């Protein structure tokens, strides 16, 4: 019984992974390749990888493999030239958690820049990153040099993280008591730290506004 359940689990996983390749359009497109990776990396060229919202889950394995191959080709080309691409390469992953969640993204985030590859990934919130990468989620965030947070964030941990990254400011309060113009006056100072951008202020960002940390 245990062996049957294991086989069933393996077959179910394989079925999900290969479902995209069963698509006639995918099969026809993958039988030949018109993409010359060398030409793509040496010229002013762009590869667009797009899927409609209702097709993303089914085509995710196919698109993930395609993007992974393109990134690895860029790394290989950089290594052949001593570590850096002759012409900079931009990898822009919009809806990174939906269309093609790359297993090796934490590693790419930490090494791409040194190879002449600019990596941009766009997420809905931190919860989405953690759901995919678990303990490695913070690595994904930390290794993106620039971080742009837009308005409309509803996830409390994301709001708190933005507030923390903004840092604190020192504030000194002066209290005066007694006869302010006589000998019995008392003046005291109290120094405290507070967030530059409290969570409630970030939550109130208007459409078109954002916070860029670099």
Positions of predicted regions on the chain:
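P-loop NTPase motor domains
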Residues: 1-117, 132, 192, 200-214
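P-loop NTPase motor core of the ASCE superfamily
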Residues: 44, 106-110, 128-214
């Amino acid at each position: 019984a245990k062996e049957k359940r294991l086989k069933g689990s393996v077959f179910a996983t394989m079925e999900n992974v290969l479902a995209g390749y069963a698509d006639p359009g995918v099969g026809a497109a993958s039988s030949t390749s018109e993409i010359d990776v060398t030409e793509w990396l040496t010229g002013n060229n762009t590869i667009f990888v797009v899927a409609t919202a209702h097709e993303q889950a089914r085509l995710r394995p196919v698109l993930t493999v395609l993007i992974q191959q393109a990134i690895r080709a860029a790394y290989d080309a950089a290594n052949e030239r001593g570590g850096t691409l002759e012409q900079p390469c931009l990898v822009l992953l919009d809806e990174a958690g939906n269309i093609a969640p790359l297993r090796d993204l934490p590693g790419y985030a930490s090494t791409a820049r040194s190879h002449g590859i600019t990596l941009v990934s766009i997420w809905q919130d931190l919860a989405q990153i953690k759901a995919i990468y678990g303990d490695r989620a913070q690595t994904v965030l930390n290794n993106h040099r620039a971080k742009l947070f837009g308005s409309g964030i509803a996830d409390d941990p994301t709001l708190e993280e933005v507030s923390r990254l903004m840092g604190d400011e020192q504030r000194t309060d002066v209290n005066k008591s007694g006869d302010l113009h006589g000998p019995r006056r008392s003046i005291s100072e109290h120094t405290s730290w507070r967030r530059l951008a409290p969570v409630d202020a970030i939550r109130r960002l208007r459409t078109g506004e954002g916070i860029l940390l670099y």
